[in-house]
Amino acid sequence: MVLRIVASLLSIAALVLMAKDKQVVYLNLAGEELTLEAKHSYVEAFVYLVYSNGLVAIYCFLLVFALVFRLIDKAGCGKSAAWIIFLLDQGLAYVLLAAAAASTEVAYVAKRGNNKVGWSEVCSTFGHFCNLVGVSIVITFISVLAMATLSVMSARRLFKTYGPERKQISSNDAPAI
């Protein structure tokens, strides 16, 4: 349960950093004042990152809520609930990984540019924006690790529901040696 809270908090932190990240730059080109603005909503990959982090944060929060108030019995989780949790953990881990990877590519192009297609880098102009984007992406990758760990844990819990029945062996049932 603690790891779900950590994943939720990490996703919220990454979401807030990216959603609030904005920078306005004023340039003087040939005597003309030019205003340039950078914010996450201008880049689809960053919008995807914000929504993915929000989805993970809400899911983890709702599952923690359900576990705390025993809406889902943690110890005696039935097969259907174990399957649902496993599939959602897996799916959201992959969604978050895809969002982080897409955002990393966009951030890389913003930082380095791409000479083959004539795209220049923009982080020298929007340094503060690029730095916060980088921090948000790093936090998202940490959240991906938390979700991947949760996926392994939920898979283990699921596979235990298909394990052999364990019965207690009394001293009378022990085989003679």
UniProtKB/Swiss-Prot annotation:
It is found in: Cell membrane. GO terms for cellular component: plasma membrane. It holds the Pfam family CASP_dom. Keywords: Cell membrane, Membrane, Transmembrane, Transmembrane helix. The keyword Calcium does not apply. The chain crosses the membrane at residues 1-21, 49-69, 81-101, 132-152. It is a multi-pass membrane protein. Residues 70-80, 153-177 are extracellular. Its main location: membrane. Residues 22-48, 102-131 are cytoplasmic. InterPro entries: CASP/CASPL, CASP_dom. Homodimer and heterodimers. Belongs to the Casparian strip membrane proteins (CASP) family. This is CASP-like protein 2U1. It comes from Osmunda lancea. The lineage of its organism: Eukaryota, Viridiplantae, Streptophyta, Embryophyta, Tracheophyta.
